[in-house]
From Swiss-Prot:
Span list, region Targeting to endoplasmic reticulum membrane: 136-188
Lineage: Eukaryota, Metazoa, Chordata, Craniata, Vertebrata
Location within or outside the cell: Endoplasmic reticulum membrane; Cell membrane; Cytoplasm; Cytoplasm, Cytoskeleton
Principal cellular location given in the protein's record: endoplasmic reticulum
Topology in membrane: Multi-pass membrane protein
Oligomeric form and interacting partners: Binds to prenylated RAB and Ras superfamily members.
Pfam hit, one: PRA1
Keyword flag Signal: no
Segments traversing the membrane: 36-56, 57-77, 94-114, 115-135
Similarity section: Belongs to the PRA1 family.
Species of the source: Gallus gallus (Chicken)
Protein name: PRA1 family protein 3
Amino acid sequence: MEVQVAPLRSWEDFFPGSDRFGRPDFKDISKWNNRVVNNLLYYQTNYLMVAAAVVAIVGFLSPLNMLIGGTVVILVFLGFVWVSHNKDILRRMKKQYPTTFVIVIMLSSYFLISYLGDVMVFMFGITLPLLLMFIHASLRLRNIKNKLENKKEEIGLKKTPMGIILDALEQQEDNINKLASYIPKVKE
């Protein structure tokens, strides 16, 4: 299947009035996780633009440090993904504790970059866009169009770059399994 880039959502859709934002239910982690994953899929191009703007600003201010910091984070992330696919314990940790997995990647990157003296570039250049994405994805309530687009991605009618990343982090398999177990129930 061909990978499709998700369309850039309008500013009114991406950042509407305060009535389309709501505090997540911290007691129901799976519901909160579902909101974050679905918003990451739906607004992925907008998030890419925000990240590119922040990275460009920081990169302009400190290009060498930004390059070193970005390289280290990518290498650490690829290393963890490779190790987790080859080691059962890490794979289970990634599946059961995805937030912990990402925090371990960030902390590992922090320590590697601190040896190079580029901690501030890492913190502002790479972590700030991730934090902004997470905050928006956590607070933004979904709409009908969002839910429809996410269903297309879940059942495999389309594939997007964020969908590939979430698959690598094993965040979409549960949704597909839920859908697969729901279809026979509907037929009955």
